[in-house]
């Protein structure tokens, strides 16, 4: 399992020189599995460059892509409008929030709203790729390709999900926008236990 960071910022992208070390794009992570298959976590502005890189690679395994969303606040979905693979009719893209408490139709309506003509010139139903909105109502899921997914809700206004992704003996945990409050969120602790890699933001730390 290989992890590539395409966006590490929150709230808004930042172009200023002092942010060059970690980049200026909002949340977007690429996971490349041992089979060569990929998954994307969050669709912030970093997904624009990620899409360009995937097009340049032109690999058939990129025709079916899962984009797992922690939540749908703007900085986690704003790049999807500029994700070039979404305009390619050869692609099948699954947009997903795994975990209990959010309906698939709600997820689709969020994207449809952001692409209304008041905000964007291309409507969701006119986008080129085949889109699937997927929200299994479970906290644990085994993908047919043998990837284990555990989703856990954590403290954030409007709710957000962390993901524990396991391939073979390697485990990645992705928890962003976590607001621990006076005590550490016990859900995050349980989700992260014995992980090989924890991706956790530091925006809300003292």
Predicted regions and their residues:
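Binuclear metal-dependent hydrolase catalytic cores
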Residues: 1-173, 189
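DG-centered beta-turn motif at the end of beta-strands
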Residues: 175-177
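Cap/insert and terminal regions of metallo-dependent hydrolase folds
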Residues: 179-206
């Amino acid at each position: 399992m290989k992890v590539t960071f395409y966006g590490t910022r929150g709230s808004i992208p930042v172009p200023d020189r002092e942010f060059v070390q970690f980049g200026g794009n909002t949340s977007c992570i690429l996971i490349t599995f041992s089979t060569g298959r990929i998954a994307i976590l969050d669709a912030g502005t970093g997904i624009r460059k990620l899409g360009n890189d995937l097009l340049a690679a032109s690999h058939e395994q990129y025709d079916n892509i899962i984009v797992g969303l922690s939540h749908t606040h703007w900085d986690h979905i704003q790049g999807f409008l500029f994700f070039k693979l979404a305009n390619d009719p050869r692609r099948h893209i699954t947009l997903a929030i795994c975990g209990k408490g959010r309906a698939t139709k709600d997820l689709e309506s969020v994207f449809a709203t952001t692409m209304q003509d008041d905000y964007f010139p291309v409507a969701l139903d006119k986008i080129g790729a085949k889109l699937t909105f997927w929200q299994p109502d479970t906290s644990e899921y085994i993908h047919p390709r043998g990837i284990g997914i555990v989703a856990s809700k954590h403290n954030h206004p409007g709710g957000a999900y962390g993901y524990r992704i396991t391939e073979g003996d390697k485990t990645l945990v992705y928890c962003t926008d976590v607001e621990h409050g006076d005590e550490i969120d016990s859900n995050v602790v349980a989700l992260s236990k014995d992980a090989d890699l924890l991706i956790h933001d530091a925006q809300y730390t003292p």
